[in-house]
Amino acid sequence: MSGILEQETVMGIVEAKNLTFEYIRRDEEGNVEGITTAVDNVNIDIKAGDFVAVLGHNGSGKSTFAKHLNALVMPTEGTVYVDGMDTKDSGNTLSIRQTAGMVFQNPDNQIVGTLVDEEVGFGPENIGVPTEEIWERVEKSLKAVGM
């Protein structure tokens, strides 16, 4: 060996290839009225341990990009991989959501239940935890904080 280490090619924990997402506006009959490109041909490869910030003005596509990371929306074009899983493959959705989480910047977008126990149970429900186990976790969690 000549002292030069060969770098192993490793897929990132998040990888977007030619990611494009378009919002399509339709009239009441379903005819296309307009298309807005929110994410335009983004390529990024984030490795374990990387720190990444996505910055931009309001309406620049940051949240739309983030929604691709846990398969809340699907690319119009291109591909997004999370821990090697293609977000377009519906068979991967649960595993992706167990791997990549999201916390919205506005609390009104995060609160989903009208009762505290529904809100506490929201996360486990979205990652496929069985209902009985969800309620056990909710009860234990609320008890731990005196509720």
What do the PLM-derived regions correspond to, one by one?
Residues D108, T114-E125, W135, E139:
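Short helical segment in ABC ATPase nucleotide-binding domains corresponding to the A-loop/adjacent helical element
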